[in-house]
């Protein structure tokens, strides 16, 4: 299954060429060989057929070289481009820059920006959909450095022996018939003193598969003190805005479902979330973001940030104008065929919603906030974010709908038998708005609860986070020692102290009931009136439920923020309905309704109990019943709580 149609070497490799040792090949030839291996080993025959149809039916022919330009790529993917009259995102140039860099893999140092030939597009799709495991077995499933390079601008150091007034060319927009063009300077060695050996895993694995390690070493043997690479704030913000808009995208779902109705109100929310995410990155004095900072924040705070790129580029593997009911000879693919037009925007379906109907509608969550959450919250499995894992949010409790009562909170939350997402918004003493939340994959438990019906894996850890005005994430502590300590639950509820997340629970005492105390790297406490919250963050302590945020994200000392709560919501996590229906059993919604029905029946029974009638035995029996229910006596104080 060759790649002859767009290669600049004039066709498939001949048998005599195949017999030559790899070390005798040029970089362009090695790049071509890798693309051919990707094509044959990383795609099914049907996927490769669709990819060829999509590419060649739209390709521009210049002197026998077929390629895509920025407009072709943007139009196919449905990405707003600067050439459009109304373009609030203007993400086309950023995506084109990225793929022009990735198309030169693994020789970005000398071949990037590449012309988007078919061979280049094969590598782009393989890298962005993470299909390279069948070829690059030694590579980490880690694209951070590669993605950084595809986004980075270059600032040249004032090193006299290397300057001579030369400028680094980064023009990736104008395609040229020759694929050997000046490289991106991000791949010029830059005296990186962090993770050098790990950074090149993908490239080394690619060249190892070609027996061309020596070629790579020769290509990289340059002065590592000449260039500094930085991602500009504008470039990253434009990419973030696109990712926020398309984060719910499913495979083969039209992108325009999410990009066709970008009203000013919608764009205001998108910009707000992008700015909150941008605030998490410390910038250089020049305003750019270094690789070290980019890798640190993406790894620790946004593990799923680039997930939307996978379904976006999987569109290339399905052609709408390929008629599978007829045999079509596409071996040489030299002629373009008419491309089936997309449905008019008026006929596009509405974007699906993650929130289920229930007792209230959110005043905190909107589509942009949910996209922000999907960049770091897992689903019932750690491998997928909660959007790609098809998790749904069921409305459980809201202060707007149910009031600021702990009794109401207990009635709605403690009867929910799956994980929960707690979010609140309010102001700090300066009047600045904050949005804080906690992701609790295991259900809250009442004191006498012994079982959990959560469909979420125990390996999915809780986390504490701040969404605005600056993104901050405190990951769950994976230590089994911490998880087994019953006095340090992820979340705790008590009618006497309120709600405590990430706190240490003191021993119970009849004479002196002490409130839970903040413990470890982070905690959130909410008073009994649900009006005030305290958010504690410590930069170094690691003995609690949550781990410290990335270094440099917070001050060097413990910070306590008092929040006047405006709104508080608890959302139930409903796993993928297709998975849960296959497993059988009742859903969390059905179980909650059953508990409410049981509580109603018990309440009716209690009304018939009269402590002042009957003999002493009847009175004692009735009192015992109410104490057991935690409604009167010492049992009420001991049992008025819950944890998760």
UniProtKB/Swiss-Prot annotation:
GO terms for cellular component: cytoplasm; nucleus. It is found in: Cytoplasm. Pfam families: TLD (PF07534). One of its GO terms (biological process) is response to oxidative stress. It comes from the Eukaryota. The keyword Kinase does not apply. Residues 338-348 have a biased composition (Acidic residues). InterPro entries: TLDc_dom. Its main location: cytoplasm. May be involved in a process influencing telomere capping. Belongs to the RTC5 family. This is Restriction of telomere capping protein 5. It comes from Aspergillus niger (strain ATCC MYA-4892 / CBS 513.88 / FGSC A1513).
């Amino acid at each position: 299954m060759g790649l002859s149609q767009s290669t600049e070497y004039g066709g498939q490799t001949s048998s005599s060429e195949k017999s030559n040792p790899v070390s005798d090949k040029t970089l362009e030839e090695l790049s071509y060989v890798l693309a051919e291996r990707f094509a044959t080993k990383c795609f099914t025959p049907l996927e490769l057929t669709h990819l060829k149809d999509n590419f060649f039916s739209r390709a521009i022919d210049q002197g026998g070289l077929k390629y895509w330009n920025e407009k072709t790529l943007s139009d196919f993917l449905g990405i707003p481009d600067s050439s459009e009259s109304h373009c609030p995102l203007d993400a086309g140039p950023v995506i084109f820059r990225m793929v022009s860099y990735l198309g030169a893999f693994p020789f970005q140092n000398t071949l990037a920006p590449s012309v988007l030939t078919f061979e280049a597009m094969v590598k782009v799709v393989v890298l962005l959909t993470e299909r390279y495991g069948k070829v690059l077995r030694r590579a980490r499933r880690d694209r951070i450095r590669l993605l950084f390079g595809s986004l980075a601008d270059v600032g040249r150091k004032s090193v006299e022996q290397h300057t001579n007034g030369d400028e680094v060319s980064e023009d990736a927009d104008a395609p040229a018939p020759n694929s050997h063009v000046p490289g991106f300077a991000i791949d010029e060695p830059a005296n990186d003193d962090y993770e050098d050996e790990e950074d090149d895993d993908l490239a080394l694995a690619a060249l190892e598969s070609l027996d061309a390690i020596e070629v790579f070493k020769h290509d990289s043997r340059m002065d590592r003190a000449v260039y500094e690479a930085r991602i500009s704030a504008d470039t990253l913000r434009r990419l973030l805005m696109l990712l926020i808009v398309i984060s719910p995208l499913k495979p083969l779902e039209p992108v325009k479902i999410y990009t066709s109705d970008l009203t000013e109100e919608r764009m205001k929310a998108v910009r707000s979330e992008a700015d909150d995410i941008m605030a998490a990155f410390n910038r250089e004095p020049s305003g750019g973001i270094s690789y070290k900072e980019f890798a640190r924040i993406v790894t620790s705070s946004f593990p799923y940030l680039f997930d939307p790129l996978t379904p976006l580029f999987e569109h290339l593997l399905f052609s709408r104008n390929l008629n599978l009911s007829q045999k079509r000879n596409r071996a040489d693919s030299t002629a373009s065929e008419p491309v089936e037009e997309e449905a008019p925007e008026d006929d596009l379906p509405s974007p699906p919603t993650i929130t289920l109907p229930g007792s209230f509608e959110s005043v905190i969550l909107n589509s942009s906030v949910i996209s922000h959450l999907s960049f770091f919250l897992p689903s019932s499995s750690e491998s997928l974010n909660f959007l790609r894992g098809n998790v749904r949010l069921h409305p459980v409790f809201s202060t707007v709908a149910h009031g600021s009562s702990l009794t109401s909170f207990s009635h709605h939350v403690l009867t929910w038998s799956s994980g929960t997402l707690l979010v609140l918004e309010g102001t700090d003493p300066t009047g600045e708005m904050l949005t804080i939340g906690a992701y609790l994959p295991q259900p809250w438990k009442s004191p006498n609860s012994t079982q959990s019906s959560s469909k979420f894996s125990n390996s999915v850890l809780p986390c504490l986070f701040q969404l605005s005005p600056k993104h901050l994430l405190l990951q769950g502590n994976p230590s089994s020692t911490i998880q087994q300590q019953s006095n340090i639950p992820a979340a705790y509820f008590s009618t006497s102290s309120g709600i405590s997340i990430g706190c240490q629970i003191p021993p119970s005492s009849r004479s002196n009931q002490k409130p839970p105390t903040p413990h470890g790297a982070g905690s959130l406490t909410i008073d009994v009136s649900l009006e005030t919250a305290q958010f504690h963050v410590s930069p170094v302590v690691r003995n609690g439920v949550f781990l410290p945020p990335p270094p440099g994200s917070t001050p060097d000392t413990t910070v306590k923020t008092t929040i006047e709560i405006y709104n508080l919501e608890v959302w139930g996590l409903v796993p993928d309905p297709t998975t849960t229906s296959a497993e059988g059993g009742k859903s969390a919604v059905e179980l909650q309704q059953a508990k409410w029905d049981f509580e109603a029946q018990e309440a009716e029974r209690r009304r018939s109990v009269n402590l002042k009638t009957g003999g002493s035995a009847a009175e004692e029996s009735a009192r015992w019943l109410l104490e057991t229910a935690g409604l009167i006596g010492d049992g009420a104080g001991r049992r008025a709580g819950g944890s998760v």
